[in-house]
From Swiss-Prot:
This is Non-structural protein 1. Keywords: Eukaryotic host gene expression shutoff by virus, Host cytoplasm, Host gene expression shutoff by virus, Host mRNA suppression by virus, Host nucleus, Host-virus interaction, Inhibition of host innate immune response by virus, Inhibition of host interferon signaling pathway by virus, Inhibition of host PKR by virus, Inhibition of host pre-mRNA processing by virus, Inhibition of host RIG-I by virus, Inhibition of host RLR pathway by virus, Interferon antiviral system evasion, RNA-binding, Ubl conjugation, Viral immunoevasion. Gene3D superfamilies: Influenza virus non-structural protein, effector domain (3.30.420.330), S15/NS1, RNA-binding (1.10.287.10). GO terms for molecular function: protein serine/threonine kinase inhibitor activity; RNA binding. It comes from Influenza A virus (strain A/Whale/Maine/328/1984 H13N2). A motif (Nuclear export signal) lies at residues 137-146. The keyword Ligase does not apply. One of its GO terms (biological process) is symbiont-mediated suppression of host PKR/eIFalpha signaling. The gene is NS.
Length: 230
């Protein structure tokens, strides 16, 4: 196993522990708490994949961070912070919408890279909007936290989420996954549109009312791809 992979996991475990302590003291806002919950699932998946104990990794990560802090001068820290571009966290969904449990009558699921696409194929003839919470850097989607499809009544009928065991995805991966979800929903004569935030940063091929511009052949192709169940 690559030593950098192990040390990266150890540091991530310790930093998650620090963030959890901050949350326990009620110092974190909604995006902070949301990322904390998502990252916990990711760390569990990575730990299982690597065969590493999280508690042991957290202690090792603490030692790595302490060693770096001992060697780091205040001036070097200021320069590092100034040179790192800041990402923004954008939210279409409330914390309740993100954490709400939902069920599918006719479940379909597909894994596309490090993203999991789920939808209820029992949904027909509905107006559906896609909402997402994600981070942006350089005016491009950096990391998808969660995307969900909602009917006008507020029911959840589809979802795209990162796989905890396979961290890392590009904005193009997200766009392709959105296309698959849209194609599957439109196959059942649903009308799908994306939120303004998604239009701007993740799904740029939309017309003026926010509906995706997909030709019929591409819709059918995307709908067929979601037939592959995990």
């Amino acid at each position: 196993m690559d030593s950098n992979t192990v040390s990266s996991f150890q540091v991530d475990c310790f930093l998650w522990h620090v963030r959890k302590r901050i949350a326990d003291q009620e110092l974190g806002d909604a995006p902070f708490l949301d990322r904390l919950r998502r990252d916990q699932k990711s760390l569990r998946g990575r730990g299982s994949t690597l065969g590493l104990d999280i508690e042991t990794a957290t202690r090792a990560g603490k030692q790595i961070v302490e060693r770096i802090l001992e060697e780091e001068s205040d001036e070097a820290l200021k320069m590092t912070i100034a040179s790192v571009p800041a990402s923004r966290y954008l939210t279409d969904m409330t914390l309740e919408e993100m954490s709400r449990e939902w069920f599918m009558l006719m479940p379909k699921q597909k894994v596309a890279g490090s993203l999991c696409i789920r939808m209820d194929q029992a949904i027909m003839d509905k107006n559906i909007i896609l909402k997402a919470n994600f981070s942006v850097i350089f005016d491009r989607l950096e990391t998808l936290i969660l995307l969900r499809a909602f009917t006008e009544e507020g029911a959840i009928v589809g979802e795209i989420s990162p796989l905890p065991s396979l961290p890392g995805h590009t904005d193009e991966d997200v766009k392709n996954a959105i296309g698959v979800l849209i194609g599957g929903l439109e196959w059942n004569d649903n009308t799908v549109r994306v939120s303004e935030t998604l239009q701007r940063f993740a799904w740029r091929s939309s017309n003026e009312d926010g509906r995706p511009s997909l030709p019929p052949k591409q819709k059918r192709k995307m709908a067929r791809t979601i037939e592959s169940e995990v």
